Amino acid sequence: MNAPDKLPPETRQPVSGYLWGALAVLTCPCHLPILAAVLAGTTAGAFLGEHWGVAALALTGLFVLAVTRLLRAFRGGS
C-alpha cells in the first residue's frame, strides 16, 4: 500500500523510533531472567545459561545502542 520510500521523512522517523524502542525493551539487561525462562529448553537458552556474563554484557551494549538510536529518532537527529 504505502511503500517506505514513498512516506514523507517526518513519518518515517517515528516508526524507526518505535522499532528501536521495542528493541531496547527486549534487550534491557533487567529482562535477562525472563529471557532465560522463555528460552529454557532451547539451544539459545543453553547458551544463555552457560554464558550468563557474556549475554548480560552483549544485551547491555545492544540496549545502550538501541536507546541512543531511539532518542536520536525522536529528537530528529540523524
UniProtKB/Swiss-Prot annotation:
Predominant location category: membrane
Cystine crosslinks: none
Protein name: Broad mercury transporter MerE
Example of a GO MF term: mercury ion transmembrane transporter activity
Entry membrane topology: Multi-pass membrane protein
Role description: Broad mercury transporter that mediates the transport of both CH(3)Hg(I) and Hg(II) across the membrane.
Organism: Shigella flexneri
NCBIfam families xrefs: PRK13747.1 (NF010310)
Domain of life from the UniProt record: Bacteria
Pfam families: MerE (PF05052)
TM helices/strands, residue ranges: 19-39, 47-67
Record keywords: Cell inner membrane, Cell membrane, Membrane, Mercuric resistance, Plasmid, Transmembrane, Transmembrane helix, Transport
GO cellular component: plasma membrane
Subcellular location: Cell inner membrane
Lineage, top ranks: Bacteria, Pseudomonadati, Pseudomonadota, Gammaproteobacteria, Enterobacterales
Secretion signal span: none
